Amino acid sequence: MADNYRAANWLPDEVGGICWFSVDNPGQSPRIPIFCGTTELPESFSICGQKTYNPDCILWQFRRANRLATIQWQSTKDGFNEKILKHEENAVNGIPQAAVSPAILNAYTEYVYDQAVETWKEMEGEYWVKFWAGF
């Protein structure tokens, strides 16, 4: 797990600071924004995956693609890093700039999380196809 905190005086008080949260290998995992005004997180954040495999756990939703990419990092790193940067750019550009309710902040966190899960799921499938005959 890794996180970055950012005090954001240029954002409305309802948004406030942002915790950019990631799991597994922080160099490979997406950052999910959690705002000071957030009151709910996606369900998968409450499921522990440290000692058992659970595909509904946030950890395992990113770990599978991360591990596959690591095995052949020389051939995956450029595309992988492009997807991380695109995800982070989209997440930053969508941060609410006006006064918003906690429900909107919750929905934005969920939206960024859902987009990241979909991207990492696509990468996992891509890597299984790429490496099906062996690593």
Regions found by a protein language model. Give the residues of each.
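C-terminus-biased signal that marks the final domain/tail of proteins
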Residues: 1-135
